[in-house]
Amino acid sequence: MASHWVGTWTATPAPADGVALSSPTIRMFPRISIGGDTMRIRLSNAAGTGDLVIAATHVAKRGAGAGVRPDTDRVVTFNGSGSVKIPAGAFVVSDPVSLTVRPLEDLAVSIHVPGEIPASFGVTGRYARQFNYLSPPGDFTGMEIMHASRVIDDWFFLSGIDVLAARDVGGIVALGDSITDGNISTHDAFCRWPDQLARRIVTRGGKMFGVMNQGLGGNRICHDIRGDSGVRRFDRDVLSQPGVTHAIVVLGVNDIRNRSGRKEEEVTADDLINGLNQMAMRARARGIKMFGGTITPFENETFMVGAWSPERDARRVAVNEWMRSAGAFHAVIDFDKFLRDPEHPARMLPIYDNGDHLHPGDVGYNRMGDVIDLSLFD
């Protein structure tokens, strides 16, 4: 059967503000969604202001702690070379790597970045909601047990892992903000709603889909913050993902909250509707089935005190009603309906609330993954 590349794991490239590095090996532990016998690694210098040199990259199956299983360790090359130079704003894709991996397996990707990288360079990263590791200066990419000088909560430079899959295997991209990224969920518990979606697809069996989490904390539809806005990054983070057949967009709450606090960045419901409609049309034009996720309630949130108001909530309600009725998306996933308090729809039901009244907790994130109708992907 013919095969093609499908994304099995992603991390949205964004600026890791204030991060400086001193010739470390970075060991990170992504959990993939689908398996395969051949993979490739994607590294990004999206936030960099100059060339980024990666001196060595290894991939293996995870061992204990910061370790790897040495029998699975593979050297990753780029056009036959163990090192690669990535221009500012660019990314690179590795040569194919022969390693058989199972769905939902934990991998270890180790990269060595030589020399001093000051904070002014612009390190590319994203919050991980799990423990990854930095070494003292030196190349420890091939070591089974890497001495860690620092525990980090980031993905540095690693932006994707693809597997070679049968032609009938599809890809689902989750485009969102911190609620998609699983902010404030338990570390190393894999409680993000895309994690739960991936588990359900694997458990169901049958037709398989890679699940690519392109959540980015603080992200908005209309304005940049901590990286590109939803409409700006849509081509890179959705349309260009290997094997993508379906996408779910869950954005808008940070626009309504005015996460930046700038008066000139206040938005109307129509602004958000226009942005969402653009994404839906662009996906359809590429043959991708696009699903809209309604905006969840956030009355009296404490993450950014004063961000909620009745007037802002009215915008949220208006956008959600448009999503449900306009037919712009192939289907709507009504996260608002499933998470809100039926007795008080402007707020999240306490069992799903992590306590800041904006982000779900582990139970809420798993609920989001559970309410997605898997028949949407048939």
Predicted regions mapped to residue ranges:
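C-terminal soluble interaction/assembly domains
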Residues: 254-258, 263-277, 284, 291, ...
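Catalytic nucleophile-elbow at a beta strand-turn-alpha helix junction centered on a G-D-S/GDSL motif
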Residues: 169-195, 217-220
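Structural recognition of the beta-strand scaffold that forms the well-ordered cores
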Residues: 171-176, 180, 209-215, 245-250, ...
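Short, solvent-exposed loop/turn and secondary-structure capping segments
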Residues: 119-124, 183-190, 222-226, 259-262, ...
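Short amphipathic alpha-helices and their capping/turn segments at secondary-structure boundaries
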Residues: 159-168, 189-203, 226-243, 278-282
